[in-house]
């Protein structure tokens, strides 16, 4: 007797998801292209078991955050807008200042904008680890180097 073919949609179970750790060297990579690939892997869209409402993604460690590239005139024109929710609490930071002081924020902000803005998106975002410089504390997870074109 042969096995019958099932046409039911597969739905991943959280306990069955296998997580892999990846490391990305951001040196010389364009910010937006890198962020979209990171968001895809965090979400799990690179896996055949992808299920939209389940966290099927992998962990990402990004190093050399201060060496990411911005195309065009974004290094002079791009700004980050924050507000403290107090009167006069508007703060506008230029991207070149943010890269100098907190380079991790530039990559985190770009990736966060590409993830769903709900509970699942916050859970996915916690799997992103960004570091300035080449050292990171996740060597014990033996991350696989990921190449982005």
Curated annotation (Swiss-Prot):
Top-level taxon of the source organism: Bacteria
GO CC, alphabetical: cytosolic large ribosomal subunit
GO terms of molecular function: mRNA binding; structural constituent of ribosome
Pfam families documented for this protein: Ribosomal_L13
Keywords: Ribonucleoprotein, Ribosomal protein
Gene3D superfamilies: Ribosomal protein L13
GO terms classed as biological process: negative regulation of translation; translation
Described function: This protein is one of the early assembly proteins of the 50S ribosomal subunit, although it is not seen to bind rRNA by itself. It is important during the early stages of 50S assembly.
Assembly notes: Part of the 50S ribosomal subunit.
Family assignment from sequence similarity: Belongs to the universal ribosomal protein uL13 family.
Protein name: Large ribosomal subunit protein uL13
Encoding gene, per UniProt annotation: rplM
């Amino acid at each position: 007797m042969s096995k019958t073919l099932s046409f039911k949609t597969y739905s991943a179970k959280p306990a069955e998801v296998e997580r892999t750790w990846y490391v990305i060297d951001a040196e010389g990579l364009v910010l937006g292209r890198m962020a979209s690939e990171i968001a895809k892997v965090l979400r799990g869209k690179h896996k055949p078991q992808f299920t939209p409402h389940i966290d099927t993604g992998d962990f990402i460690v990004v190093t050399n955050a201060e060496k990411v590239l911005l195309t065009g005139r974004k290094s002079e024109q791009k700004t980050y807008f924050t507000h403290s929710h107090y009167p006069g609490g508007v703060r506008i930071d230029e991207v070149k200042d943010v890269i100098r002081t907190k380079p991790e924020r530039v990559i985190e902000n770009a990736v966060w904008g590409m993830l769903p803005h709900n509970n699942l998106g916050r859970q996915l975002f916690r799997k992103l680890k960004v570091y300035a410089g080449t050292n990171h504390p996740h060597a014990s997870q033996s991350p696989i180097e990921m190449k982005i074109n």
